[in-house]
Each structure stands twice: as structure tokens, then as C-alpha cells.
Regions:
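Conserved small/polar residues in nucleotide/adenosyl-binding loops
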Residues: 227-234
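Non-ligating segments of multi-cofactor redox enzymes
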Residues: 149-221, 225
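Active-site cofactor/cluster-binding pocket
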Residues: 1-180
Length: 235
């Protein structure tokens, strides 16, 4: 139509959904439910097929199998590093999107991306432009289809580990009832009663240990010998 879309809500049934960070799978974010039956779900991860299956929650497995969702995996992290893009995976993943979603003819979409990259980065040098072009070409073909096992249709999560009486403390209940649902972006489903133990604003200490985001692909390490050498040279 001619009227702009001003809807303040997310699309809930999309033809294509992509998970750009594998930590969202581990945390149980319910992204798969936003894929319409027969749609496409792309996951950026460094996992093998077996590792991917191990990390997927049972509820997501059931939805994928029962709604014929097409699942594709891509390691944009490694690809970006190999073509000289460092940690910048967005170009690789955008290229994969155009190749899979088919909202435009793939060849046209990739050429548009290359033209935009040339225009945007030519001032930074030909090497930067070439790296972007390589990322575009790589992303268009580097994904692989994951064959969904038939038993995913009836998948069940492993039985939760029962906490001992000693560890069934207020902090454990707080994490289970509040922090975990909120952390996987499911906080809107919590009833008011879940917050009643904290109606006075008091919360148990120590919960930060359970709120690790886990979104970093790599972490820095400190070379104490190098630091000592530099410090000695400065004296």
C-alpha cells in the first residue's frame, strides 16, 4: 500500500530468520518460533552438525521438525577472518541471506552488495574493497544444509538436575524463576506473582555469576612475560 508501516512490534512469522550469534541458541532464545512453516533458519556457528543438535533445545527441535523448517549452518566467524574482515561477519551473513531468502535474484543482490562496498570503502583502499568482495562471494556459497533428524519431532529435554536441599537456596530460586526466563528474552511471560518475593526491592546477592552473556567468540589473554619486558624497557 501507500501508507508507511508504523507497527511497534516484531514480525512473528517470517520466511527467513537468522541467528548471528550461537550463544543465543545455548541460552534458549525462542527464535525458531518466528519462522513460518516451510521457512528458513540460518545459524552462524562453528559447530559440527552433531554439536549443533546437542545445543538445540527440544522445543526448537520439535518446532523445526513439525513445521518443515529448512535449517542451514554457516561459519561466518572463520570466513570473515580468512578473507581479511577480522571479526566483521555482517557482510558474509548478509550475502548468505540473499542467497537463501531469494528476495532478489542472487546474482543481482551480490552485485549490488559489491557496488555498495566499492562506493563505501574505496577511500580506505583497494585491499578493504577486495576483502569485502571476497566476503560477499564466500557468504553466498559457504552455508550447508542441516538434515533434520526424524526423531526431532518428538524431542524431549533431558530431565533437569534436582538440586540438593542445601543448594535450594533463595539465589537458586531467583535464578530459576526470574533470571533465566529474562535472560532468554522470555520475561514478558512471567506472571506478577513471580516478582512478589521481591516486592520490597530486595534481591539476593551473587546472581551475576549466572548472567554470563557468552557472546564473545574469543577472549584476550595477558602475556605476563611480554608485559614485564615492556615495563623493564620503560624504566
Amino acid at each position: 500500500g501507500d501508507s508507511p508501516i508504523r507497527s511497534p512490534y516484531y514480525v512473528t512469522k517470517a520466511d527467513f530468520v537468522a541467528c548471528h550469534n550461537p550463544s543465543y541458541i545455548v541460552k534458549g532464545f525462542k527464535m525458531v518460533r518466528d519462522v513460518k512453516p516451510g521457512g528458513t533458519f540460518l545459524v552462524n556457528c562453528q559447530w559440527s552438525d552433531e554439536e549443533f543438535a546437542e545445543h538445540m533445545p527440544a522445543v526448537a527441535k520439535r518446532y523445526i521438525a513439525n513445521n518443515n523448517v529448512n535449517v542451514y549452518l554457516i561459519d561466518a566467524i572463520d570466513l570473515a577472518a580468512k578473507v581479511g574482515m577480522g571479526k566483521r561477519t555482517n557482510t558474509v551473513l548478509q550475502s548468505a541471506f540473499f542467497a537463501l531468502a531469494k528476495v532478489l535474484p542472487a546474482e543481482d543482490a551480490l552485485q549490488y552488495m559489491k557496488d555498495a562496498a566499492t562506493k563505501s570503502y574505496m577511500k580506505k583502499g583497494q585491499a578493504i574493497v577486495d576483502a569485502n568482495h571476497k566476503a560477499i562471494d564466500a557468504g553466498a556459497t559457504a552455508f550447508r544444509k542441516f538434515e533434520v533428524p526424524a526423531d526431532w519431532a518428538t524431542a524431549e529435554d533431558a530431565a533437569p538436575v534436582e538440586l540438593s536441599e542445601e543448594t535450594k537456596s533463595a539465589i537458586a530460586q531467583q535464578v530459576k524463576n526470574l533470571l533465566e526466563p529474562i535472560d532468554r528474552m522470555d520475561g514478558d511471560s512471567l506472571p506478577v506473582s513471580a516478582f512478589m518475593p521481591h516486592v520490597d526491592g530486595q534481591w539476593e546477592l551473587g546472581a551475576a555469576a549466572y548472567e554470563k552473556r557468552g557472546v564473545a567468540v574469543s577472549v584476550p589473554t595477558w602475556d605476563c612475560l611480554l608485559y614485564t619486558s615492556d615495563a623493564a624497557d620503560d624504566r
